[in-house]
């Protein structure tokens, strides 16, 4: 997201980065965050808050890096040569601002030692703030940010204008206005006040409209150029990612309905839902964007990789792997939910928890196979990228001709 946003903002604003040194700090600072997380998490040095596990010194580093990132991004927009700000930059801007607010508010803590702190919130309030953060981290980090990528790379790879620019503007304002209210659906049937749970459910259902508006806008950009899907495997990644986005954003509001949530909560269905977004939407649009960008970094035409057949092979491996992964978790989740709520005539549970785990084993095997296929596809991509970076210029010229 950082790389693509700083690339896109330069091209669409016709301006160089506000500060190359600050951008370099963002890169190396973020690598330090990753290394710090890789060291502290296995040692058990965590806050125990989902998605916000890192302790306070690393949280401060994240804040510094994020502020630098925001300065570079918005500074570049401020010195733009164009009057108009392209819609992709709107989504990136929302992602940067929202994640900053979410991170600071949810990570407020009282340090006890260098490696231990306690949240300033307690009980139900802590849970509410945590899932306001958790849901919107998904909403702005994994949705708004990647929609910014979509609004640039889909029309660019298809060589077509966005289907409806007006729809993209409506999509933007509707999404950022509604998304922030949907967090309570993670806390159905808890000590959270019932009206807050109901508000979260209602906002989640409304959220379906702007989400599908974005999906339709992306897919319909191919109007008049559907034949490109047969010949361009990079475009396949981008369009199929939108299909998974649509599926995931239909499933999310459905799972937010209290009666459905009573069956799905705590089961593998939730894991299937998350990975339809993480593998199907986030990973596949990122892969498509990388296939578009990597040749450009080495002075070639967009999408001009070493082997188009390997991209095609990777596409099918990623798609099949994702489908196996999420379908197995859907089946497991429904089965677990039904087994856990089954009772005998005297009110005792029909199945023990261990029996539900045993019944889930075939699904876990299918998930392992699907994940293995997806991972193997990434090795195919790594090989293709490695060969692309070593293509002699003569071969590049021949491929272009």
State the predicted function of each range.
Residues 143, 147, 161-265, 270:
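Membrane-embedded translocation segments of transport machinery
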Residues 102-111, 182-189, 242-270, 278, ...:
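Specific lipid-exposed transmembrane alpha-helices and their immediate membrane-water interface residues
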Residues 77, 83-89, 97-133, 150, ...:
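Juxtamembrane/interfacial segments at transmembrane-helix boundaries in multi-pass membrane proteins
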Residues 17-33, 84-100, 158-177, 225-251, ...:
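Interfacial and helix-entry/exit segments of alpha-helical transmembrane bundles
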Residues 393-401:
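Short, highly charged, low-complexity non-transmembrane loops/tails of multi-pass membrane proteins
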